[in-house]
């Protein structure tokens, strides 16, 4: 199949020379750089070169000694003339010798071979010249004119060099003029490479398709795959799907991509969430028994490990074993790391023992290193098996080339901190120093974090300051941990102190630190300081997240600062942050407290337009607002709307709001009716429910109802609180009532006349 026409349409960089085709083959297959082992041949080469160097070039043709050497040398291997040409050291001498040899070629016993090999050496010199174009064209013309067959090496050199000079047509001409039986895989590989590098993808694939045919005389080899796959992926010449199909076609010839390329491709597929496709590629290559190594499998194992797909990891390792692909030290690391992360430490230890000491495909032995030991020690610490972790550390110290490092000790420190053994963690730091391993910032952060989690903020501060004296400086994580800890105990002053210290230390705060400070300041209602931190956050190039906006809006609503509330909402809109249910609920509550029901309705409508359904908190805020201004009819209307038109059902809080409102108005019947409705709808009343009802009752006229409600609390295990006791003490002032109150406090029924007295009553009543 000719590819000349398709190329000539697109490239006119070189006008093809119009020569008639050779009547004979135009190539000669010879090893490119043969070694001359015979001493007599080496003697001939040395003697010939010395004679040439000692004879003026214009006297070569008439030199009888040189003529005699040509005759005597021709009885040796034709390789002699290749070596002689090569040793002349320059293109000018090499071409002159070739022309001399051609003139004397009638004296050569194996003329074609001798001239072919000598010409190959001249071509090698020409290609290394500063401007080789004309020289290479001349040599190619000489070969055609004199019917000197090119060696395979010379052919490949011409195709490659013409291609590099942008003379792709000339490269193809050299290839096309070869006899078909001389277009072997080596030559085709060079042609495909030249065409791909020059962007002639279709033409390259015409040559490649011939190689990939099932009965191809010259099938692809590993070099073919390397050339094609590297170029098409690097230049994005084919889609992933077409590359996968191409790999399959190579696989059918028993050819696999080189391990480095295949590993990168598998990794790319995994990164694009195509682990199943990566699996299929490796399965196809294994099915066709192509030579494979561990790295591509490691790439897929890493992906499966990140997804914690241990079952498929196990299947893949079994497949590797079936086709005799030996795992390597990286495989070991991936397996034990995944097993440890999934808390399957015993299996990780088992794999560790089974694989270490085994030989890899390159003949090396899998040896445990510090990373493996650190992974296992960390895994043991994460599941609280600290004693075994310590034992593994002792074993690690005895292992060759496995010296514990800061990571090792930091894993142990983290384990002890997780277990709350802070003093032991500090002892490990001392052991680090004894082993001449310097604690680092991770060490500091681990212990500071552990102390802060276990309510040891002061301990954390002392430890951090001691480490600073030893030259170990904190980083953003250190300060963020301390700031979070201070905010969690509402010690905002100290949080701001550590914020200032962080700036002094040259650490740039990240958004999380600003969010922590804003949260802490909002909790203690320090709006001016919160605004200052927001300004610092924006100066640092950060923006508020939705949670921070909601906290600030809540703070300004509590402070009745409507101006700042609107400012925050405007800022949110500029930043492209859409309000969520929390934002709307906060605003609805704010407007409700200010009796601005028009804005409340507008907010609820806007909420629905934004695709947000009002939540139970939304309804609670509005109902509470109506109740607070005595608009109980509107509150009940909205309450009933919840059951009819909304997916949100009233909860205990909403019922309590209404019960409390009716109780304040002395409407016990309506309040009690709502409590009974709670029972029917399986909404559990709490102590606030009963407190509201108790407040509405008068012991003299409604004493029996009061006692029944007390019994109901006992039945539902609803614990009374201080407010309950204060209300009941006012309602039950007589001696009999006080006995009942005491029984109620002890968890006994008080209304039933058949209720047995507690055996302890005799003592408690005196």
Curated annotation (Swiss-Prot):
Q: Which Pfam families match?
A: PPR, PPR_1, PPR_2
Keyword annotations: Repeat
Q: Where are the PPR repeats?
A: 151-181, 184-218, 221-257, 258-292, 293-327, 328-358, 369-404, 405-439, 440-474, 475-509, 510-544, 545-579, 580-614, 615-650, 651-685, 686-720
Tell me which family the UniProt entry assigns to this protein: Belongs to the PPR family. P subfamily.
Q: Which PANTHER family match?
A: PENTATRICOPEPTIDE REPEAT-CONTAINING PROTEIN GUN1, CHLOROPLASTIC, PPR_LONG DOMAIN-CONTAINING PROTEIN
Q: What is this protein called?
A: Pentatricopeptide repeat-containing protein At5g28460
User: Native species of this protein?
Assistant: Arabidopsis thaliana
């Amino acid at each position: 199949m000719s590819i000349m026409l398709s190329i000539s349409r697109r490239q006119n960089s070189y006008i093809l020379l119009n020569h008639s085709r050779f009547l004979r083959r135009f190539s000669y297959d010879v090893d490119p750089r043969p070694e001359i082992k015979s001493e007599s041949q080496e003697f001939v080469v040395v003697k010939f070169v010395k004679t040439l160097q000692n004879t003026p070039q214009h006297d070569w043709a008439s030199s009888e000694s040189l003529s005699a050497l040509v005759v005597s040398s021709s009885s040796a291997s034709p390789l002699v003339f290749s070596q002689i040409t090569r040793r002349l050291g320059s293109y000018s001498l090499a071409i002159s010798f070739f022309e001399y040899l051609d003139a004397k070629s009638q004296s050569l016993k194996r003329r074609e071979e001798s001239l072919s090999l000598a010409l190959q050496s001249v071509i090698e010199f020409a290609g290394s010249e500063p401007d080789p174009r004309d020289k290479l064209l001349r040599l190619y013309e000489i070969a055609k004119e004199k019917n000197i067959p090119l060696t395979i090496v010379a052919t490949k050199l011409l195709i490659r060099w013409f291609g590099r000079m942008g003379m792709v047509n000339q490269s193809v001409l050299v290839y096309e003029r070869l006899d078909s039986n001389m277009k072997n895989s080596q030559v085709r590989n060079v042609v495909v490479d030249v065409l791909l590098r020059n962007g002639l993808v279709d033409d390259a694939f015409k040559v490649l398709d011939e190689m990939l045919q099932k009965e191809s005389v010259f099938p692809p080899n590993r070099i073919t795959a390397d050339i094609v796959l590297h170029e098409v992926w690097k230049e994005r010449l084919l889609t992933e799907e077409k590359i996968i199909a191409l790999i399959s076609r190579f696989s059918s010839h028993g050819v696999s991509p080189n391990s480095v390329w295949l590993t990168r491709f598998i990794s790319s597929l995994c990164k694009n969430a195509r682990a199943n496709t990566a699996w299929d590629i490796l399965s196809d290559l294994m099915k066709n028994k192509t030579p494979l190594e561990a790295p591509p499998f490691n790439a897929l194992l890493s992906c499966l490990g990140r997804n914690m797909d241990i079952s498929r990891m196990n299947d893949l390792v079994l497949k590797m074993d079936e086709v005799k692909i030996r795992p390597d030290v990286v495989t070991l690391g991936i397996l034990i790391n995944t097993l440890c992360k999934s808390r399957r430490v015993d299996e990780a230890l088992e794999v560790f023992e089974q694989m270490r000491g085994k030989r890899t495909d390159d003949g090396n032995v899998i040896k445990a290193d510090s990373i493996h030991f650190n992974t296992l020690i960390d895994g043991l610490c994460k599941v609280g098996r600290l004693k075994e972790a310590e034992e593994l550390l002792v074993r690690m110290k005895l292992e060759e080339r496995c010296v514990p490092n800061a990571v090792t000790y930091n894993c142990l420190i983290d384990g002890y901190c997780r277990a709350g053994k802070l003093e032991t963690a500090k002892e490990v730091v001392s052991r680090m120093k004894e082993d001449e391993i310097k604690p680092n910032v991770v060490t500091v952060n681990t212990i500071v974090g552990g102390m802060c989690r276990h309510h040891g903020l002061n301990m954390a501060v002392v430890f951090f300051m001691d480490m600073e004296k030893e030259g170990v400086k904190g980083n953003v994580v250190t300060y963020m941990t301390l700031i979070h800890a201070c905010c969690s105990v509402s010690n905002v002053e100290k949080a701001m102190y550590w914020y200032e210290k962080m700036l002094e230390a040259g650490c740039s705060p990240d958004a999380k630190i600003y969010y922590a400070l804003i949260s802490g300041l909002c909790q203690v209602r320090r709006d001016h300081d919160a605004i200052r931190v927001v300004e610092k956050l924006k100066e640092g190039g950060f923006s508020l997240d939705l949670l921070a906006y909601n906290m600030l809006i809540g703070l300004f609503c509590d402070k009745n600062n409507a101006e700042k509330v609107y400012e925050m909402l405007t800022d949110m809109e500029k930043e492209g942050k859409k309000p969520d249910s929390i934002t709307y609920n906060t605003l609805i509550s704010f407007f409700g407290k200010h009796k601005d029901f028009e804005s409340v309705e507008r907010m609820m409508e806007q909420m629905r337009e934004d695709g947000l359904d009002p939540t139970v908190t939304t309804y609670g805020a509005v109902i509470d607002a109506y109740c607070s201004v005595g608009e109980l009819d509107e509150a009940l209307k909205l309450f009933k709307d919840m059951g009819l038109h909304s997916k949100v059902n009233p909860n205990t809080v909403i019922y309590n709001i209404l019960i409390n409102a009716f109780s304040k108005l002395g409407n016990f019947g309506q309040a009690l009716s709502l409590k009974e409705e709670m029972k029917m709808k399986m909404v559990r009343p709490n102590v606030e429910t009963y407190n509201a009802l108790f407040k509405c009752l008068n012991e003299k006229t409604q004493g029996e109802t009061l006692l029944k409600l007390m019994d109901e609390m006992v039945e539902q295990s609803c614990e009374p609180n201080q407010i309950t006791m204060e209300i009941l003490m006012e309602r039950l002032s007589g001696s009999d009532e006080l006995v009942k109150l005491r029984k109620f406090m002890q968890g006994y029924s008080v209304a039933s006349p058949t209720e047995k007295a507690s055996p302890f009553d005799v003592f408690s009543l005196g």
